[in-house]
Amino acid sequence: MPKLRVTQIASVAGRKPGQKETLIGLGLNKIGRTRVLEDTPSIRGMTRKVAHLIQVEETNEAE
């Protein structure tokens, strides 16, 4: 199954609480942190919600 490499590129300071919670749900809490996640509809929805705070790349690598 394809995977997504998600990297936080901006701070959550001054953002809505829901955006901070979404980043925590993605496993991100500091700028520069990267996670490799399964490409599922729920993960895609979460990445769209905070697209201005993260960088997303499609990949096939294992964790």
From Swiss-Prot:
Keywords: Ribonucleoprotein, Ribosomal protein. One of its GO terms (biological process) is translation. Transmembrane segments: none annotated. Pfam families: Ribosomal_L30. GO terms for molecular function: structural constituent of ribosome. GO terms for cellular component: cytosolic large ribosomal subunit. Belongs to the universal ribosomal protein uL30 family. PANTHER family: LARGE RIBOSOMAL SUBUNIT PROTEIN UL30M (PTHR15892:SF2), MITOCHONDRIAL RIBOSOMAL PROTEIN L30 (PTHR15892). Part of the 50S ribosomal subunit. This is Large ribosomal subunit protein uL30. The gene is rpmD.
